[in-house]
């Protein structure tokens, strides 16, 4: 009987959390002219937050942007003066293009607002934050709001780009991979890996901060409280150490042992090494999804060395398969806006010291 009593006062809690990756689903909502994008119409915001949370994704996106800007952007003489200040915010054309590249690498698309006069002469160009853009089913309208998902949120409505209308509009670019209304980011196949890398970082942070991140037994040796108190204590411990902040723990409520609370760590099962191996494979998966080599972004996770020739060959391949296609997209976009080719990227000059 006593044995059964002891067992009844031992509580196990597996506090591992399965993280749900948002789906990039498109949906027509009754009463709304635009098509929603993801749960609560906030999938682009999820991608943006993923970029902010992941040092690896930031490094890749920012590096791709720098590579894509090249050594210089040559402008046609016809737009030289305009390029020095493309809007009332005082932005230069290069500023606008850099923002566009960032959006292309995070979201897979971009949007540019065009301001014209009554004779359809171009007056200003503005970058529109792509995470705030939605479109209607026939792609004739662009809707812009900073508060998608909030009750009662409103959106500014723009016409989709049409050079013959003689009024301002928005050039909406959704890339080449999508078969629907919204773009697909290049790294879509690596999103789970990016999430995993952020959880690994959190695990190590909490390992250092809390020194409490492996399977643990917690003995409360100052009496056995009733079930309500036990449940409350379990919730408090789970709230303190959850997700990647801890693993499975066990609470034991005992009548004595000098009224002390004792913490016993079980064998850690080489968890640090498992995380290290997981991080290595995760990193590889992220870079594969971006068709990139870690060394091009200052990383060489396996410490295998990387010769100058290998580096140059890797950059040449990456430049041909990722950077140049994105540069050509931007050149075509501005050809649309001005009616003729007006910009040309001078390739990034990669200098590698022996």
What are the language-model segments listed below?
Residues 176-333, 342-351:
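A contiguous, surface-oriented mixed alpha/beta subdomain in the mid-to-C-terminal portion of proteins
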